[in-house]
Amino acid sequence: MLEIIEKENDIEQFFDVLNKRSNMTKNSKFVETVSQICDDVLNNGDDALVNYTKKFDDPNFELKDIEVSKEEIKKAYLSVDKNIIRILEEAYDRIYKFHLTQVRKDYSIKDEYGTIMGVRYTPIESVGVYVPGGKAAYPSTVLMNVVPAKVAGCENITMVTPATKGVLNPIVLACAYIAKVDHVYRIGGAQAIAALAYGTKTIKKVNKIVGPGNIFVALAKREVYGSVGIDSIAGPSEVCMICDETVNPKYAAADLLAQAEHDEMASATCFITSKEKAEEILKYVNEFYNSAARKDILTKSLNNCSKIVVVKDINKAIDYVNRLAPEHLEIDTKDPMDIMAKIKNAGSVFLGTYSAESFGDYMMGPNHVLPTSGTAKYFSALGVDDFIKRSTFQYTTKEGAKALSNDVNDFATLEGLTMHALSAKLRGEE
């Protein structure tokens, strides 16, 4: 189970464990299998999709079952408890309003010759969203991935999600209805990613694929990247906490367990300056564990990938966090804003005693699709920017052309590109 560590050597050994966990997709034994599945879908289209869906999800599956009709989606929405619908719609509204703040505006500048140079933003036309199904059916995944695409203005949003013996989770379909997804297909796994990337007779090729999934989905996204854009290769979920003597140990314990229950490789790490508070947190972790529904998962994730780390001061905790670049970071101290100013690497930051990470997972508004496995050093949370393209433009006047002509002619000649030089020179001679 979860333990407290404070020796430098123990901390470094723990970091080694986390680093090895981060490389799980690189060394996976399933790489060849996923590559074969993707090639099969590329070459055989719908036939391959049907065969794999029969093999993995539903032995009675037929091609006519692949698309979920608008009527079935609406029926699912109407079948869901009204209070659940209220919650889903409230979550949609909050997520939508937050992402509206990310919308970019075109801009331009003009130089002394009247030359105009600028940037324009256009939405990606077609996006595919992967939503896990079966036991790991997460309606929040629909909202968090679809809403920013809607805000960006994507014309076509296609959702794929695997069914269990032909049956889809009605709450997942209700979210698709609320978010106005254009097409829903009951397929999953690497074959679904390949279908979105390459297209089949039934499923149109998309320009970008987003959404989480298991190791097969992650490897498939890596396999098709280049034929299509992707969001990222998601690893196991993780949280780091920075706490001092003011922390509420009950809250901290609950938040560590909330993260650890995601899956067996999930990581929950608390950096804390008080040994006494660390022991209190551990006491509540053990107490709350007894009432958890997912004890098997918790046991493995707490044993393998989680620790309470006692540090000499807050600055040491900050150093460790910046090194790990966690997906989620909770700062539960007397001065959380001051500490956040020193954080360089984190996917999303939750400030203060009352900002539970679970609020962000569902209803707060910012996106819960975040960089994992240390990639917060160079990746960001999913947002509107992930669904738009930035193009530059330039309009040069006759005077502007003359001003640039000689220098560009000489620059191109320097590089040995004589036709570039001619193109510039001709305009300067008018």
What name fits each language-model region?
Residues M1-E125:
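N-terminal Rossmann-like NAD(P)+-binding subdomain of aldehyde/semialdehyde dehydrogenases
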Residues L2-N9, H183-G188, I308-D313:
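Short acidic-hydrophobic, aromatic-tinged amphipathic segments that line or gate anion-handling sites
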Residues I109-A174:
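Conserved small-residue-rich beta-alpha loop and adjacent elements
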Residues E155-T164, A268-K275, I281, G352:
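Short internal beta-strands
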Residues K180-Y251, D255-A258, H262-S267:
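Conserved NAD(P)+-binding/catalytic subdomain of aldehyde/semialdehyde dehydrogenases
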Residues H262, C270-A346:
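A glycine- and small/hydrophobic-rich beta-loop-beta segment
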Residues R323-E430:
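C-terminal core of ALDH-fold dehydrogenases
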